[in-house]
Amino acid sequence: MPTTTRSSIPEHVAIIMDGNGRWAKQRGLPRVMGHRRGVEAVRETVRAAGDCGISYLTLFAFSSENWRRPESEVSDLMGLLKAFIRRDLAELHRENVRVRIIGDRQGLKTDIRSLLEEAEQMTAGNTKLTLVIAFNYGSRDEITRATASIARDVAEGRLSADAITPEMISSRLDTSGMPDPDLIIRTSGEERLSNFLLWQAAYSEFLFVPEYWPDFDRQRFFSAIEQYATRDRRFGALAEQVAVAGA
């Protein structure tokens, strides 16, 4: 467990799970083996997040750009998602974990969409941890869909353009009702957001770790939380102002 105080635990942690393919390549294995080992890292991280009192854990599972990958790899990823939900949903429900899905569901195959909806519906009343799965997700697409929704309301007279605020835009995003991420972790040593939670990351702390996702374990997660606790979050203010506000 992290050695930080409860007040230093982030409410919302988001993770870009990167490096499955490179993990497999290093070991002379097919890429799908990296993805399979990555599922084990997901299970371990979800348990760790629940154990240390995090309220929201968002995992970037499949981006809207991932459809460009070889058809065989996409098929493997879809199969792993279905297997994860079928195998783990009952346990997540028993552990009081709520599942939410963000991303564009239009165009998904019926069986995938039905499984995602089943996971949300079964766990809707759970309160310990909200596990947010970003699937067929791209932040630019999310923002485009949100602003198009607002534009339609303005065009049809339901909304004044003068009434548009950052809070309104946030309410139209897939993450509506969720706090912005306090901490965004990316594995594999890459240092970029890759079209993930661009709007929501305005004041997030970032941690880029060298481990490939299949090697990211419980202790590495706790270490990330401890590193977060050392950060000085100012939200655009001076350090002195933050200190006074927290006094």
UniProtKB/Swiss-Prot annotation:
InterPro entries linked to this entry: UPP_synth-like, UPP_synth-like_CS, UPP_synth-like_sf
The entry's keywords: Magnesium, Metal-binding, Transferase
Residues holding Mg(2+): 18, 205
Disulfide bond entries: none
TM spans (from-to): none
Enzyme class: transferase
List of catalytic residues: 18, 66 (proton acceptor)
Sites where the protein binds substrate: 19-23, 31, 35, 63-65, 67, 69, 186, 192-194
Cofactor note: Binds 2 magnesium ions per subunit.
One GO term (biological process): polyprenol biosynthetic process
PROSITE patterns in UniProt: UPP_SYNTHASE
GO molecular function: ditrans,polycis-undecaprenyl-diphosphate synthase [(2E,6E)-farnesyl-diphosphate specific] activity; magnesium ion binding
EC number: 2.5.1.-
Family the UniProt entry places it in: Belongs to the UPP synthase family.
Self-association and partners: Homodimer.
NCBIfam families listed in its UniProt record: PRK14830.1, PRK14834.1, uppS
Its job: Catalyzes the condensation of isopentenyl diphosphate (IPP) with allylic pyrophosphates generating different type of terpenoids.
Protein name, as recorded: Isoprenyl transferase
Species of the source: Agrobacterium fabrum (strain C58 / ATCC 33970) (Agrobacterium tumefaciens (strain C58))
Gene (UniProt): uppS
